[in-house]
Amino acid sequence: MGGRYERAITIETAMRNISERRYLLPSIQRKFTWDIDQICRLFDSVMQHYPVNSLMLWKVDSAEIREGFQFYEFLTKYVDRFGENNPAFDTKGHGEFSAVIDGQQRLTSLYIGLKGSYAVKKPRIWWPKANDPSILPPRKLYLNLAAPLDPEHNDDQLIYDFQFLTEADVDRRTTDEKNLWFEVGRILMFPAVESDDEIVDHVLDYLGSVGQASNPFARKTLSRLYFAIRREEVLNYFVEESQDIGRVLDIFIRTNEGGTPLRPSDLLMSIMSASWEDARDRVDELVNFIRTELGFTIDRDLVMKAAVMLTNADIKP
């Protein structure tokens, strides 16, 4: 059994599928690796009508796979070092779902930008032993509706000023001709309407409430955000229907060769997870224990290399 391409969907539909656990992550997937700049560039690309690479989903029908393999939810609140692991999800008794084989980084980035937060450490402060919001404050994605980015100081050809900001950051930036920060996730709370005129009406209502109804860039940008997230079917995807875990693993390895390179530890974890259902959880638990209880900063790579060495297998530094 092979697969097929399905009709493209909106970003809003994909976000709903993630929230309702219709999209899950298989244990062969690696961690979320994108940084804040990559997420902002993705949103700018969507706003500029740039194509988003196709997704690949695995429709999981086999009861044996549903019950014998671990699946995970998407990250909502990412915290550097302390909130990087996806929550495990029990699929027993769960309805239909698909596992994301290719496109995890993009979907997670969109989900965090629209429904979650991203926490990184403040500069010039020591790393805490546990998650401390005063040191790693949650940041939400905002879009500056007041003005575009300055092309003379913008090597990436970005147009839209997306930034992850804390509540304190937003409070410090008063609304003026250069600052009108809109929380991107709020676009999902706008009324669902069909006609273009109705969309513009709601955009003007919002801008009028913040004293920016006469700003043409703000009107065009907020309208563009609505269309990009809620109206345009920009996410193309392929559905793999095979229930052969070996075939799915091979597809995962091949499709990920073109994106962020798979590290040897990523590949080894994927292979292990295909036959040891909670390998990922056990390794992550050990990493967290060594970090929090013993005070050493290590990552999954070191643990995986140590495991290979202890089995007397060939290992490269």
PLM regions: where:
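Basic- and aromatic-enriched surface patches that contact anionic nucleotides/nucleic acids
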Residues: G2-T33, Q38-D314
